[in-house]
Regions:
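Short acidic/polar active-site loop segments enriched in Thr and Asp
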Residues: 62, 124, 147
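A conserved beta-turn-beta hairpin within the catalytic core of GNAT-like acetyltransferases
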Residues: 82-92, 102, 148-149
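Conserved active-site alpha-helix within GNAT-family acetyltransferase domains
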Residues: 108, 120, 132-151, 155
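Conserved GNAT acetyl-CoA-binding A-motif
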Residues: 111, 118-130
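Residue-level recognition of the GNAT/N-acetyltransferase active site
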Residues: 98, 131
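Conserved beta-strand segments that form the floor/walls of ligand-binding pockets within enzyme
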Residues: 77, 91, 96, 127, ...
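Acetyl-CoA-dependent GNAT
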Residues: 7-8, 12-87, 111-113, 117, ...
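Conserved acetyl-CoA-binding loop-helix of GNAT-fold acetyltransferases
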Residues: 97, 103-116, 143
Length: 160
């Protein structure tokens, strides 16, 4: 699969929702850390977060932020992938709205933008995972038209 250039993405977002924009700079990532930490509380260091994102970018990971009056209130991390199960798809690694802004449609707006991006990039679907115990997120995804399609298994390894 030919992964679209990131330069293409801002124009797709700008046409659709002016409150959304890519989070590309180190400053952007630092401002994203407190919001991301609400989804990923195990992330305790801003410097480690920025370093991880920079490594993940080498694998195609990108972040989009949603802004209310220049304040970052929600974000989505995604990447384009292709496999034998789904074909070409957009995978959503992270989707979170700051606690104080939940219910204000920021998550919906981000998902809509990601769907437009996936379609414009020739993807066959949008895929994401959520924890089995995360009933609130599951209700949100069902309301947004996403359906369950798989059960993921994992095995935790002891670290040396």
């Amino acid at each position: 699969m030919k992964v679209p250039l990131h330069n293409f993405i801002p124009s797709v977002l700008d046409l659709a929702d002016t409150a959304l924009r890519p989070l590309d700079s180190t400053h952007d990532l630092c401002s994203a850390f407190p919001v991301m930490q609400q989804l990923r509380p195990h992330l305790t260091s801003e410097a480690d977060f920025v370093s991880r994102i920079e490594r993940m970018r080498l694998e195609g990971y990108r972040l989009i932020g949603a802004f209310d009056a220049d304040v970052l209130v929600a974000l989505a991390g995604y990447r384009f992938q292709e496999n034998l199960v789904y074909g070409a798809f957009l995978y959503v690694d992270d989707l979170v709205t700051a606690e104080a802004q939940r219910g204000d449609q920021w998550g919906s707006r981000l998902l809509q933008a990601l769907e437009r991006l996936a379609r414009a990039s020739g993807c066959e679907r949008l895929v994401l995972y959520t924890g089995l115990a995360n009933a609130r997120a599951q209700r949100f995804y069902f309301r947004e038209g996403l359906l369950t399609g798989a059960l993921r298994f994992q095995k935790q390894f002891d670290t040396p």
